[in-house]
Amino acid sequence: SVSINKNIPVFGGLGGGTGNAASILKVLLKGKISKSLLNKAESIIGTDLRLFFWNQGFLSNLKNITYFRKKKLFFILVKPNIRCSTKEIYSKVRKYSKKQLLSQNKINTKNKFINVISQENNDLQSIVEKKYPIIKKLLIAIRDEKGCCFSRMTGSGSVCYGLFKDQITAKKALNKLKIKFPSFWFSFAKTV
């Protein structure tokens, strides 16, 4: 029996439940799974299970991510009052963009790292923006906050985030956004 206490919002695109399930499956199945079992598990657990099982998330192509964990970055996370269906959003993707190969040798400063990740995109974001215009409005509001390096939607939505280099600036932006969007869920996070 496994019990998970989830302290993040459901339907946020943060992959909490699915990511935890994938980790447990990986251990139980010793990292090996047939395509048919994976398809069956996805129908029960979540459409994005294979991304977590095969470590296909953002920055997964870096061999040693420890270096990047030392870079102190700060995030504000905002979830509007909408529920994005992961299955529905993924079903509308026609083509995934090719991810760039990242070299730790070329990304050796915080600014270079931020520049590289700001060039990446979320293939699901435009789909969600069309269905829920508030996502685009929220992303613009976050991006326009002083000190925000860039804003983006997480996973299949609906949580949006902004990346900041400075904790004080990020917290000020968070407080301003809470006034603009009082009914939304908010959180502050930092790299560990």
For the regions a language model picked out, list residue spans one by one.
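Glycine-rich beta-strand-to-loop/alpha-helix junction loops that act as flexible
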Residues: G16-G17, M153-S158
